[in-house]
Amino acid sequence: MSRRHSAEKRPTEPDPLYGSTVLSKFINKVMESGKKSTARRIVYNAIEKFSKRIKAENPLEAFEQALENAKPSLEVKSRRIGGATYQVPIEIPANRRSSMAMRWIIGHSRGKAGRSMEDALASELSDCYNNQGTTIKKKDDTHRMAEANKAYAHYKW
């Protein structure tokens, strides 16, 4: 890695169907082994099933709402001070929030055995939209952990 210049952040291309950069990032996270067309098909079919399940007029807005509900605002990071390690709560930057939410949704969808990825993803998105399910539980656990360690917030760096 060069010490002189940091890499330029390339703009994300919007997805072809909805024209959303957020959805494009989500598709890229679902993609495995470079199979983008397969990832697109899975995500588009999952969003279609999800929007029918919740009877949404605009599937993209419903998807973004589900993602918004899954975004954490606080997390804990380990900080070593004088031989002791403290879990210090910190606020999460916006790009990391959405990245974590996407990873959690996809991870919990992959963990649902015996279903197609489309069905599992649609189910997880509808759970997030309704503020329930494993992804929301993960977010609440993260917030609870940060709340429990609020006493160490002054160790922020």
Swiss-Prot record:
Molecular function GO terms recorded: rRNA binding; structural constituent of ribosome; tRNA binding
Gene3D superfamilies, per database record: Ribosomal protein S7 domain
Record flagged with keyword tRNA-binding: yes
One Pfam family this sequence matches: Ribosomal_S7
Biological-process GO terms, alphabetical: translation
UniProt GO cellular component terms: small ribosomal subunit
Statement: the UniProt record of this protein carries the keyword RNA-binding: yes
InterPro entries listed in its UniProt record: Ribosomal_uS7, Ribosomal_uS7_bac/org-type, Ribosomal_uS7_CS, Ribosomal_uS7_dom, Ribosomal_uS7_dom_sf
Keywords (A to Z) from UniProt: Ribonucleoprotein, Ribosomal protein, RNA-binding, rRNA-binding, tRNA-binding
PROSITE patterns: RIBOSOMAL_S7
NCBIfam families: rpsG_bact
Assembly with partners or alone: Part of the 30S ribosomal subunit. Contacts proteins S9 and S11.
Family: Belongs to the universal ribosomal protein uS7 family.
Entry-linked PANTHER family: RIBOSOMAL PROTEIN S7
Function, in words: One of the primary rRNA binding proteins, it binds directly to 16S rRNA where it nucleates assembly of the head domain of the 30S subunit. Is located at the subunit interface close to the decoding center, probably blocks exit of the E-site tRNA.
UniProt name for this protein: Small ribosomal subunit protein uS7
Gene transcribed to yield this protein: rpsG
